[in-house]
Amino acid sequence: VTAVDYSTKMLEEVRRNLETEGLKAELHQMDVQSLEFADNSFDAVVSRNVFWNLEHADKAYEEAYRVLKKDGILILEDGNYYRRFFSDKYQKAYDEFQRGHEKEEQGCHARHNKENVDFSIMDEIAKKLPMSQVDRPDWDFNKLVETGFHKIQVEISGSPLPMSFCIVAQKG
């Protein structure tokens, strides 16, 4: 198992979690948009909540394809977390969700905000990110086809609009 993250703090967290669970993995600090691994290195690439915050998600898909062995699998979990800033229909769905859960502590941020993080900072960053401006997973599907992936399966969560999704794709 090999783990990659751009943030050294996240890698420290991974290291602690591995130690707690008695597991081992190689940890590397690098940019998924420019991986330092040789071609055809991995059987699988797994990504969770990474692509939404990339400047060049297309390059990250190309890199995943490059480092996967033939018939290797990409598993991606991601979402349209900040699409509401650029889409009226997403903003409307977000507002309706918020109204329906005013008295509950809902959402990932509310459930996991252990240090009183000011999420308005993340909102401002997300407004500048290109993936907040595209309809996903449609964009991802088209990019995967263009990159050479096949046997692409998409599972969407969220109603009435896709808020999060999981994609499994195979290298041709």
Where are each of the predicted segments found?
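A short SAM/SAH-binding and catalytic strip from SAM-dependent methyltransferases
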Residues: 44-57
